[in-house]
Amino acid sequence: MSLMKEMLSVGVHFGHKKAFWNPQMKEYIFGINHGVHIINLEKTVPLFQDAVNFVGKTVANGGKILFVGTKRQAQDIVEAEAKRCGMSFVSHRWLGGMLTNYKTVRQSIKRLAQLEKMREDGTLESLTKKEMLQNIRTIEKLEKVLGGIKEMGGLPDAIVVIDSNKEHIAIQEAQKLGIKVVAIVDTNSNPEGIDYIIPGNDDAVKSISFYMKKFADAVIDAQGLDRAVEAKADEAAQA
């Protein structure tokens, strides 16, 4: 099946109601059907391919990708696909300063690691019941917000965002730090300042699954390429 047909089958072309449009998305709109803007997939297909290729190249060069999708219908998909390809993710709430104040965030990640170790080795059980419950609540709270980035080990090289409107703070932080931004941009969104714009439906579960699967597959393919290059380098060094 062609990429265009795949996109049509999962509803990537359905935008928002005409009343909610952002005029800056005009060049990506094909027309209107029953009061809903229809996205021009002839524009979306090459832009999506460019974005997927960029993600793959970034990973092949040893870079890190952070997937961001905190809206209800994106949360589980973003988490599952990010885990499948071994990349970091934010799927519950974007903590202000998650990128721009990463030093402080890193301290919270260290705290989470310490508490998890205490839980694993039984240290928590030696505390009073009140202290133990407080620490367990802290673990749950930190895990919910930071669990997806605790293995990131530094700032990402790029972020991939589902819904540029909802994740505008994440995008602003990435822009401030010169981190590349890949984003699904619906007809009600502002495409300004996004490095890799993907005009498309950011609400339908099938569309979100489609994007995330393609990105995760690109990461996995690139990791295989990266390992193959490393293996060749090792062989050359031993020769």
UniProtKB/Swiss-Prot annotation:
This protein's UniProt keywords: Ribonucleoprotein, Ribosomal protein
Xref: CDD domains: RPS2
UniProt GO molecular function: structural constituent of ribosome
An example Gene Ontology CC term for this record: cytosolic small ribosomal subunit
GO biological process assignments: translation
NCBIfam families xrefs: rpsB_bact (TIGR01011)
Family named by the database record: Belongs to the universal ribosomal protein uS2 family.
Protein name: Small ribosomal subunit protein uS2
Organism (species): Francisella tularensis subsp. tularensis (strain SCHU S4 / Schu 4)
Gene giving rise to this polypeptide: rpsB
